[in-house]
Design a protein with these regions (language model features):
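RecA-like P-loop NTPase motor core
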Residues: 1-84
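C-terminal accessory helical subdomains adjacent to catalytic cores in phosphodiester-
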Residues: 84, 90-254
Length: 254
């Protein structure tokens, strides 16, 4: 008999028959996420779960069925626009995050660029310097848009943390009094502007949400922009598994 669970019945049956640790990630069966995490964590059973919230829900739901198995589930989510407070709270529940904004940004990190430069026959120093300059310049030009998106996400996060009692009815003014929007705005602005001023490449990769970014750097390696990510993932799955795994795992919180 299959126990009650918030997980879909078919998925729960599939997982209960598995003997590996379960890793819930974002994305779909055909997405980059599953390929990347399956290569990085070959001893885990990787389950793409769609969005961030579904990853969180799946980890919690599966771990509530531990009376039936001895296997613990954990999760990895994109950093996106989440606050440090939110990320710390999730980590306590076994849900870790990338130190880059999106999984594709892993292939823009210095370590990955240097490893891949050698394979593609490009000069590692020149390639990394060119990509770093390009990414920082592009982030600077998009800073206002990125700040606006981060501000919206931060305010949504603050609103979702408000607890309302059964007999309480909040007005717009009441809600505004519960969150300090001015402070949130200042913190977001300061962080993004500081990253630009400092040319802090790692910080920018942690803030920059733009899925087209990684598809525009292939030419720096001497290959077509459109095939860079697929080539990089294929090498992660094959000939460069050890080198790239060591480079990329550094960018997953633990």
């Amino acid at each position: 008999m299959v126990p009650d669970s918030d997980l879909p019945k078919e998925l729960l049956i599939e997982l209960l028959g598995n003997r590996k640790e379960v890793l819930f990630v974002e994305g779909t069966e055909g997405s980059y996420d599953k390929r990347i995490y399956s290569a990085l964590f070959p001893n885990c059973y990787v389950v793409p779960s769609g969005g961030c919230e579904q990853v969180i829900n799946n980890v919690k739901a599966y771990n509530r069925t531990q009376s039936l198995h001895a296997i613990k589930a954990w999760g990895i989510i994109d950093r996106d626009f989440k606050t440090e407070e939110k990320l710390s709270a999730l980590k306590e529940n076994g849900i870790f995050h990338l130190k880059v904004a999106e999984v594709e940004n892993l292939f823009l990190t210095e370590e990955a660029v240097r490893v891949l430069s050698q394979r593609f026959g490009a000069d590692a120093d020149r390639t990394y310097s060119s990509i770093k300059t390009y990414v920082i310049d592009r982030f600077s030009k998009q800073a206002k848009k990125q700040i606006s998106e981060a501000l919206v996400a931060s305010v949504k996060g603050a609103l979702s943390g408000i607890t309302i009692s059964d007999n309480e009815q909040l007005t717009a003014d009441g809600i505004a009094s519960l969150i300090d929007i001015a402070s949130i705005e200042k913190n977001v602005n300061d962080r993004y502007q500081q990253a630009v001023e400092d040319h802090d490449y790692n910080e920018i990769l942690g803030l920059f949400n733009d899925k087209s970014l990684v598809t525009s750097v292939g030419h720096y390696f001497g290959i077509d922009n459109k095939i860079y990510v697929d080539r990089a993932i294929s090498l992660l799955e094959g000939d460069l598994r050890d080198e790239l795994s060591e480079a990329l795992r550094h960018y997953i919180s633990h």
